Amino acid sequence: MKKLFVVLTSIFIAASAYGLTNSTLIDFALTGNADNLQAGEGDTNEVVPVAENLYNDNWVVWLNESARLTENRRNSYVTNVDSKGNNGAWEAGKVLGVRVHFPLAAWNSYALVKPVYELEMYGGADGTKYTEGKGVIHNVGEIKSISSWVYGRNYLISYFVNLQNEFGELKSYPMGTVYFNGWRQVRWENREYLPNVRDRVLVREPLYPRMIPSVKLDSLGFYRTKDTKGGDFITYVKDVTLEYDVVVVDFEEDIDDEATWQLLKTENDRKQAIESARIREQAELRDLEQRRIGDGTAADQGAAANTGAADTGAAQEQAQ
Protein backbone atom coordinates (compact mmCIF):
# COMPACT_ATOMS: atom_id res chain seq x y z
CA MET A 1 0.00 0.00 0.00
CA LYS A 2 2.79 2.39 0.90
CA LYS A 3 4.37 1.69 -2.47
CA LEU A 4 1.17 2.75 -4.20
CA PHE A 5 0.57 5.93 -2.22
CA VAL A 6 3.76 7.94 -2.35
CA VAL A 7 3.79 11.72 -2.11
CA LEU A 8 2.27 13.67 -5.02
CA THR A 9 3.81 16.74 -6.58
CA SER A 10 2.75 18.86 -9.52
CA ILE A 11 2.32 17.00 -12.79
CA PHE A 12 4.41 19.61 -14.52
CA ILE A 13 7.37 19.18 -12.20
CA ALA A 14 7.13 15.43 -12.61
CA ALA A 15 7.04 15.67 -16.38
CA SER A 16 10.08 17.91 -16.58
CA ALA A 17 12.05 15.82 -14.09
CA TYR A 18 11.26 12.34 -15.39
CA GLY A 19 10.17 12.83 -18.98
CA LEU A 20 7.89 10.46 -20.83
CA THR A 21 7.24 6.93 -19.65
CA ASN A 22 6.30 3.96 -21.82
CA SER A 23 4.28 1.17 -20.23
CA THR A 24 2.41 -1.80 -21.64
CA LEU A 25 -1.24 -1.60 -20.64
CA ILE A 26 -2.17 -5.08 -21.85
CA ASP A 27 0.04 -7.76 -23.39
CA PHE A 28 -1.87 -10.68 -24.85
CA ALA A 29 1.32 -12.74 -25.04
CA LEU A 30 1.31 -12.49 -21.24
CA THR A 31 -2.41 -13.14 -20.74
CA GLY A 32 -2.29 -16.00 -23.24
CA ASN A 33 -0.06 -18.00 -20.89
CA ALA A 34 -1.93 -19.23 -17.80
CA ASP A 35 1.35 -19.64 -15.90
CA ASN A 36 1.76 -15.84 -15.95
CA LEU A 37 -1.62 -15.26 -14.31
CA GLN A 38 -1.25 -17.04 -10.99
CA ALA A 39 -2.43 -15.24 -7.84
CA GLY A 40 0.20 -13.25 -5.99
CA GLU A 41 1.04 -13.54 -2.33
CA GLY A 42 -1.88 -12.34 -0.22
CA ASP A 43 -4.38 -12.63 -3.10
CA THR A 44 -5.61 -16.16 -2.44
CA ASN A 45 -9.07 -15.00 -1.31
CA GLU A 46 -9.84 -12.87 -4.36
CA VAL A 47 -13.38 -13.07 -5.77
CA VAL A 48 -12.29 -13.65 -9.38
CA PRO A 49 -8.74 -14.96 -10.00
CA VAL A 50 -6.69 -13.12 -12.60
CA ALA A 51 -6.41 -16.25 -14.75
CA GLU A 52 -10.20 -16.70 -14.87
CA ASN A 53 -10.72 -13.10 -15.93
CA LEU A 54 -7.78 -12.37 -18.23
CA TYR A 55 -6.81 -15.62 -19.96
CA ASN A 56 -7.25 -14.92 -23.67
CA ASP A 57 -9.83 -17.65 -24.25
CA ASN A 58 -12.03 -16.15 -21.53
CA TRP A 59 -12.49 -12.69 -23.06
CA VAL A 60 -15.92 -11.91 -24.49
CA VAL A 61 -17.38 -9.95 -27.40
CA TRP A 62 -20.21 -7.58 -26.60
CA LEU A 63 -22.31 -6.29 -29.52
CA ASN A 64 -24.36 -3.10 -29.57
CA GLU A 65 -28.10 -3.56 -29.08
CA SER A 66 -29.21 -3.46 -32.72
CA ALA A 67 -26.54 -6.02 -33.66
CA ARG A 68 -27.26 -8.35 -30.75
CA LEU A 69 -29.10 -11.00 -32.74
CA THR A 70 -28.73 -14.63 -31.72
CA GLU A 71 -26.64 -15.63 -34.75
CA ASN A 72 -24.33 -12.65 -34.33
CA ARG A 73 -23.79 -13.34 -30.64
CA ARG A 74 -23.16 -17.03 -31.20
CA ASN A 75 -20.57 -16.31 -33.90
CA SER A 76 -18.74 -13.48 -32.12
CA TYR A 77 -16.00 -14.66 -29.76
CA VAL A 78 -12.26 -14.62 -29.05
CA THR A 79 -9.58 -17.28 -28.95
CA ASN A 80 -5.96 -17.74 -27.92
CA VAL A 81 -3.84 -17.75 -31.09
CA ASP A 82 -0.20 -18.67 -31.78
CA SER A 83 1.96 -15.97 -33.39
CA LYS A 84 5.36 -16.60 -34.97
CA GLY A 85 6.61 -13.27 -33.62
CA ASN A 86 6.15 -10.91 -36.58
CA ASN A 87 9.54 -11.71 -38.14
CA GLY A 88 11.39 -11.29 -34.86
CA ALA A 89 9.62 -8.14 -33.63
CA TRP A 90 8.78 -10.12 -30.49
CA GLU A 91 9.17 -13.66 -29.27
CA ALA A 92 6.84 -16.27 -30.71
CA GLY A 93 3.86 -16.69 -28.42
CA LYS A 94 0.20 -15.97 -27.99
CA VAL A 95 -2.00 -13.14 -29.27
CA LEU A 96 -5.72 -12.44 -28.98
CA GLY A 97 -7.78 -13.63 -31.94
CA VAL A 98 -11.10 -11.86 -32.49
CA ARG A 99 -14.07 -12.95 -34.58
CA VAL A 100 -17.06 -10.63 -34.88
CA HIS A 101 -20.15 -11.47 -36.88
CA PHE A 102 -21.64 -8.10 -37.80
CA PRO A 103 -25.22 -7.76 -39.07
CA LEU A 104 -25.64 -8.39 -42.78
CA ALA A 105 -28.06 -5.48 -43.05
CA ALA A 106 -26.70 -2.02 -43.87
CA TRP A 107 -26.62 -0.28 -40.50
CA ASN A 108 -23.91 1.02 -38.20
CA SER A 109 -22.75 -1.44 -35.54
CA TYR A 110 -19.87 -2.06 -33.20
CA ALA A 111 -18.33 -4.73 -31.01
CA LEU A 112 -16.49 -4.40 -27.70
CA VAL A 113 -13.88 -7.00 -26.76
CA LYS A 114 -13.38 -7.10 -23.01
CA PRO A 115 -12.53 -9.31 -20.03
CA VAL A 116 -15.31 -11.38 -18.49
CA TYR A 117 -15.38 -9.06 -15.47
CA GLU A 118 -14.45 -5.40 -15.25
CA LEU A 119 -10.84 -4.99 -14.15
CA GLU A 120 -10.33 -3.89 -10.55
CA MET A 121 -8.36 -0.64 -10.48
CA TYR A 122 -7.34 -1.28 -6.86
CA GLY A 123 -7.46 -5.08 -6.78
CA GLY A 124 -5.05 -7.26 -4.85
CA ALA A 125 -3.27 -6.86 -1.55
CA ASP A 126 -1.36 -3.77 -2.68
CA GLY A 127 -3.50 -2.50 -5.57
CA THR A 128 -1.36 -4.17 -8.24
CA LYS A 129 -3.49 -7.19 -9.16
CA TYR A 130 -3.87 -6.07 -12.79
CA THR A 131 -0.70 -4.02 -13.30
CA GLU A 132 2.41 -4.98 -15.29
CA GLY A 133 0.75 -5.68 -18.62
CA LYS A 134 -2.56 -6.99 -17.27
CA GLY A 135 -4.78 -3.96 -17.95
CA VAL A 136 -4.09 -1.30 -15.27
CA ILE A 137 -1.44 1.42 -15.05
CA HIS A 138 -1.05 3.66 -11.99
CA ASN A 139 0.66 7.05 -11.93
CA VAL A 140 -0.57 8.23 -15.34
CA GLY A 141 -0.60 11.96 -16.08
CA GLU A 142 -1.23 13.38 -19.52
CA ILE A 143 -1.20 10.71 -22.22
CA LYS A 144 0.96 11.58 -25.22
CA SER A 145 0.21 8.53 -27.36
CA ILE A 146 -1.34 5.08 -27.43
CA SER A 147 -0.06 2.36 -29.74
CA SER A 148 -1.23 -1.16 -30.49
CA TRP A 149 0.05 -4.01 -32.62
CA VAL A 150 -2.88 -5.35 -34.62
CA TYR A 151 -3.09 -7.87 -37.46
CA GLY A 152 -5.35 -6.74 -40.29
CA ARG A 153 -7.16 -8.75 -42.93
CA ASN A 154 -8.19 -5.87 -45.24
CA TYR A 155 -11.41 -4.99 -43.39
CA LEU A 156 -12.54 -1.36 -43.45
CA ILE A 157 -13.31 -1.48 -39.73
CA SER A 158 -12.33 1.25 -37.25
CA TYR A 159 -10.39 0.28 -34.15
CA PHE A 160 -10.72 2.01 -30.76
CA VAL A 161 -9.05 1.59 -27.37
CA ASN A 162 -11.45 2.42 -24.52
CA LEU A 163 -9.96 3.43 -21.16
CA GLN A 164 -11.36 4.30 -17.75
CA ASN A 165 -9.66 6.64 -15.29
CA GLU A 166 -9.65 6.46 -11.48
CA PHE A 167 -13.06 8.19 -11.38
CA GLY A 168 -14.67 5.62 -13.67
CA GLU A 169 -14.85 8.08 -16.58
CA LEU A 170 -14.71 6.35 -19.97
CA LYS A 171 -12.84 7.73 -22.97
CA SER A 172 -12.41 6.22 -26.44
CA TYR A 173 -9.21 6.65 -28.42
CA PRO A 174 -9.45 6.16 -32.22
CA MET A 175 -6.57 4.06 -33.51
CA GLY A 176 -7.54 4.20 -37.20
CA THR A 177 -8.82 1.37 -39.37
CA VAL A 178 -7.54 -2.17 -39.84
CA TYR A 179 -7.75 -1.83 -43.62
CA PHE A 180 -4.43 -3.57 -44.25
CA ASN A 181 -2.97 -7.07 -44.33
CA GLY A 182 -0.55 -8.38 -41.71
CA TRP A 183 0.89 -6.81 -38.57
CA ARG A 184 0.93 -3.06 -38.14
CA GLN A 185 1.44 -0.82 -35.13
CA VAL A 186 -1.45 1.63 -35.16
CA ARG A 187 -1.21 4.76 -33.06
CA TRP A 188 -3.25 7.55 -31.47
CA GLU A 189 -1.41 10.85 -30.94
CA ASN A 190 -2.48 13.56 -28.50
CA ARG A 191 -2.33 16.71 -30.62
CA GLU A 192 -2.71 18.90 -27.53
CA TYR A 193 0.33 17.46 -25.77
CA LEU A 194 3.03 20.08 -25.09
CA PRO A 195 6.48 18.51 -24.71
CA ASN A 196 8.18 21.78 -23.73
CA VAL A 197 7.62 22.90 -20.13
CA ARG A 198 7.88 26.55 -21.23
CA ASP A 199 4.68 26.12 -23.25
CA ARG A 200 2.65 24.75 -20.34
CA VAL A 201 0.50 26.59 -17.82
CA LEU A 202 2.29 25.98 -14.53
CA VAL A 203 0.16 25.76 -11.39
CA ARG A 204 0.56 24.46 -7.87
CA GLU A 205 -1.47 21.35 -7.08
CA PRO A 206 -2.59 20.18 -3.61
CA LEU A 207 -0.41 17.24 -2.68
CA TYR A 208 -2.12 15.29 0.08
CA PRO A 209 -4.56 13.59 0.15
CA ARG A 210 -5.05 12.89 -3.52
CA MET A 211 -5.55 9.55 -5.26
CA ILE A 212 -2.93 8.62 -7.80
CA PRO A 213 -4.26 9.12 -11.35
CA SER A 214 -4.63 5.73 -13.01
CA VAL A 215 -6.11 4.15 -16.13
CA LYS A 216 -7.45 0.71 -16.90
CA LEU A 217 -8.52 -1.04 -20.07
CA ASP A 218 -12.28 -1.06 -20.46
CA SER A 219 -12.45 -2.70 -23.89
CA LEU A 220 -11.18 -2.84 -27.45
CA GLY A 221 -13.77 -1.46 -29.86
CA PHE A 222 -14.37 -2.32 -33.52
CA TYR A 223 -16.79 -0.09 -35.43
CA ARG A 224 -18.40 -0.95 -38.74
CA THR A 225 -20.32 1.64 -40.78
CA LYS A 226 -23.45 0.85 -42.77
CA ASP A 227 -21.46 1.21 -46.00
CA THR A 228 -19.13 -1.64 -45.02
CA LYS A 229 -20.08 -5.23 -45.81
CA GLY A 230 -21.39 -7.16 -42.81
CA GLY A 231 -20.81 -10.73 -41.76
CA ASP A 232 -17.59 -12.14 -40.32
CA PHE A 233 -14.72 -9.85 -39.32
CA ILE A 234 -11.38 -11.32 -38.19
CA THR A 235 -8.44 -9.59 -36.52
CA TYR A 236 -5.67 -10.25 -33.99
CA VAL A 237 -4.26 -7.98 -31.27
CA LYS A 238 -0.84 -8.30 -29.65
CA ASP A 239 -0.78 -5.45 -27.11
CA VAL A 240 -1.67 -1.89 -26.14
CA THR A 241 1.06 0.50 -24.97
CA LEU A 242 0.83 3.98 -23.43
CA GLU A 243 3.31 6.87 -23.58
CA TYR A 244 2.59 9.40 -20.83
CA ASP A 245 3.84 11.84 -18.20
CA VAL A 246 4.20 10.48 -14.70
CA VAL A 247 2.44 12.30 -11.86
CA VAL A 248 3.98 10.88 -8.71
CA VAL A 249 7.53 11.74 -7.72
CA ASP A 250 8.88 9.47 -5.01
CA PHE A 251 11.25 11.44 -2.81
CA GLU A 252 12.04 11.70 0.89
CA GLU A 253 9.76 14.05 2.87
CA ASP A 254 10.30 15.30 6.40
CA ILE A 255 6.78 14.15 7.39
CA ASP A 256 5.04 11.00 6.18
CA ASP A 257 1.46 12.21 5.58
CA GLU A 258 0.02 8.79 4.83
CA ALA A 259 1.54 7.17 7.91
CA THR A 260 -0.06 9.91 10.01
CA TRP A 261 -3.55 10.15 8.51
CA GLN A 262 -4.04 7.02 6.32
CA LEU A 263 -6.57 8.91 4.20
CA LEU A 264 -5.44 7.35 0.93
CA LYS A 265 -5.58 3.85 2.36
CA THR A 266 -9.11 4.49 3.63
CA GLU A 267 -10.25 5.72 0.22
CA ASN A 268 -8.51 2.85 -1.54
CA ASP A 269 -10.16 0.29 0.75
CA ARG A 270 -13.56 1.88 0.09
CA LYS A 271 -13.17 1.69 -3.69
CA GLN A 272 -11.76 -1.83 -3.46
CA ALA A 273 -14.83 -2.95 -1.49
CA ILE A 274 -17.18 -1.45 -4.11
CA GLU A 275 -15.32 -3.18 -6.94
CA SER A 276 -15.31 -6.51 -5.11
CA ALA A 277 -19.05 -6.32 -4.39
CA ARG A 278 -19.87 -5.60 -8.03
CA ILE A 279 -17.69 -8.41 -9.32
CA ARG A 280 -19.00 -10.84 -6.70
CA GLU A 281 -22.55 -10.14 -7.90
CA GLN A 282 -21.59 -10.79 -11.52
CA ALA A 283 -19.74 -13.97 -10.58
CA GLU A 284 -22.72 -15.35 -8.65
CA LEU A 285 -25.12 -14.63 -11.52
CA ARG A 286 -22.82 -16.34 -14.01
CA ASP A 287 -22.40 -19.34 -11.71
CA LEU A 288 -26.16 -19.73 -11.31
CA GLU A 289 -26.69 -19.49 -15.06
CA GLN A 290 -23.94 -22.05 -15.69
CA ARG A 291 -25.63 -24.48 -13.30
CA ARG A 292 -28.96 -23.92 -15.01
CA ILE A 293 -27.60 -24.87 -18.44
CA GLY A 294 -25.17 -27.45 -17.09
CA ASP A 295 -26.70 -30.27 -19.09
CA GLY A 296 -25.99 -28.53 -22.42
CA THR A 297 -23.07 -29.13 -24.73
CA ALA A 298 -19.71 -27.47 -24.17
CA ALA A 299 -20.21 -25.29 -27.22
CA ASP A 300 -23.62 -24.15 -26.02
CA GLN A 301 -22.18 -23.34 -22.60
CA GLY A 302 -19.46 -21.20 -24.15
CA ALA A 303 -21.99 -19.31 -26.24
CA ALA A 304 -24.21 -18.79 -23.20
CA ALA A 305 -21.29 -17.45 -21.18
CA ASN A 306 -20.51 -14.96 -23.92
CA THR A 307 -24.18 -13.99 -24.15
CA GLY A 308 -24.46 -13.61 -20.38
CA ALA A 309 -21.51 -11.22 -20.31
CA ALA A 310 -23.07 -9.22 -23.12
CA ASP A 311 -26.34 -8.96 -21.20
CA THR A 312 -24.45 -7.80 -18.11
CA GLY A 313 -22.72 -5.11 -20.19
CA ALA A 314 -26.05 -4.01 -21.64
CA ALA A 315 -27.60 -3.75 -18.18
CA GLN A 316 -24.67 -1.66 -16.95
CA GLU A 317 -24.96 0.63 -19.97
CA GLN A 318 -28.68 1.18 -19.37
CA ALA A 319 -28.08 1.79 -15.66
CA GLN A 320 -25.63 4.55 -16.52
Swiss-Prot record:
Presence of keyword tRNA-binding: no
Localization annotation: Periplasmic flagellum; Periplasm
Leader sequence residues: 1-19
Signal keyword on record: yes
Key words, A-Z: Bacterial flagellum, Periplasm, Signal
Alphabetical list of InterPro entries matching this protein: FlaA, FlaA_Spirochaetes
Composition-biased stretches (Low complexity): 295-320
Swiss-Prot/TrEMBL GO biological process terms: bacterial-type flagellum-dependent cell motility
One Pfam family this sequence matches: FlaA
Top-rank lineage group of the source organism: Bacteria
Start and end residues of each stretch annotated as Disordered: 290-320
Principal location class: periplasm
GO CC terms, sorted: outer membrane-bounded periplasmic space; periplasmic flagellum
Complex and partners: The flagellum consists of an outer layer composed of two sheath proteins, flaA1 (44 kDa) and flaA2 (35 kDa) around a core that contains three proteins flaB1 (37 kDa), flaB2 (34 kDa) and flaB3 (32 kDa).
Protein's name in the database: Flagellar filament outer layer protein flaA1
